[in-house]
Each structure stands twice: as C-alpha cells, then as structure tokens.
Amino acid sequence: MLDYRQRIDTLITKIEKARIAYSRHHIVKIVAVSKNASPEAIQHYYNCSQRAFGENKVQDLKIKMHSLEHLPLEWHMIGSLQENKINALLSLKPALLHSLDSLKLALKIEKRCEILGVNLNALLQVNSAYEESKSGVVPEEALETYSQISETCKRLKLKGLMCIGAHTDDETKIEKSFTTTKKLFDQIKNASVLSMGMSDDFELAIACGANLLRIGSFLFKE
C-alpha cells in the first residue's frame, strides 16, 4: 500500500529544493493528476493537505467530482477537450482548463459560455517541442493566438500558458521546450500561470520558471 504522506513529503522536499534554487520568492503549486487513481487515494492526499487535482477526461472529472463533492477540492481539466464535451465541462465549473489548443476551440467555448452564463479560466497550450503527437499552438503563433483569444473572448479568461516537455531522454531538448514557453510567458501582460513539468521533469521545469506542476505517477503509482 502507498505511503501517501511519505510520497507527498518527498515530492515537496524536491520541489522546495528546486524552487529555492530558482528564487526564494517563487511560489509553486501542485496539481495532483488523479486520472488513474481511486477516490480513496484522492481522499488520502486530501488528508495530507493536497487540494488541487487534475483529470484527463471530462467523464472521469465528472465521476470524481461527484464522488468527492463532500470535500472542498479544486479540480483542473488537463487533457485535450473535444468539442462535443464543452457543455459537460462547463457544467462542472472546473478551476482551470490547461489544454486550450486553438483559437477555433476558444471561440466555441466562448459561445457556450455565453449561452450558459458561465466563465471558464484557461491556459493556452503551446507545442513548444514541435511534436506531432502533441496538441497546442506552435511557439511562433502563440502570442498572436493568445492576444486574439484575449480580445475576442470575454467569458473564456486566459490566465497563462501550458506546455508538455519534449518526449525524450535528452535533457537539453526538454529544457529548450520549457525555456521556449517561459520566454513567451514573460511577454504576456497579466499572465500568472505557467503550467509546466510532470513527474519525470518537474525539477527542470521549476528551474525554467514553472509555477504550476502536473504530478501523476510520482504520487499515485504503486
């Protein structure tokens, strides 16, 4: 059985070391990616003071939210959002959508937000590793797309950027994908959230300026 307290304490120790090396004033938030975890495991981490959890699929988000509605949790949608799932996502009122990957999707979400009278906070996903398997706008188009969404959408509110580190063992390539995203982030006025770093590369992401981490297997893998 997992020792939940030990897992999260180990994670926090590693994050603290990387955070202080980057800047003593830097604040880093953990989103525990619970896509393969049971509600019981989430409850254990809640008991360890973890509050933000992320899901890859809208249906899983709905199931977890309903089964744990007695807890004051903060839910994030981190996986790709299909257009036919927009209404379902908006009805759940997540804290943040990490995976807004195009102007087209933004306009469709904005339209549904208007109809339903709700707002949605989101991050623009940047495909900073230029990988065909990944969603997101390419870095060269990121600032213009961000600006277009910000100017056009009133209920869909952009809060910053998200990227997935390059899928490789070459640390320099992973670092480049993070620094590329950080440079874009620094050029966006009022952007506050930089979601970079997962279980295998979060320390490198923090060194590149990440302030929100998406941690799954480090916390939940048996």
Swiss-Prot record:
GO terms for MF: pyridoxal phosphate binding
Keywords tagged on the record: Pyridoxal phosphate
Bilayer-spanning residue ranges: none
Pfam families recorded: Ala_racemase_N
Residue positions where N6-(pyridoxal phosphate)lysine is found in the record: K35
Superkingdom assignment: Bacteria
Similarity field: Belongs to the pyridoxal phosphate-binding protein YggS/PROSC family.
HAMAP family listed in its UniProt record: PLP_homeostasis
Biological role: Pyridoxal 5'-phosphate (PLP)-binding protein, which is involved in PLP homeostasis.
Official protein name in the record: Pyridoxal phosphate homeostasis protein
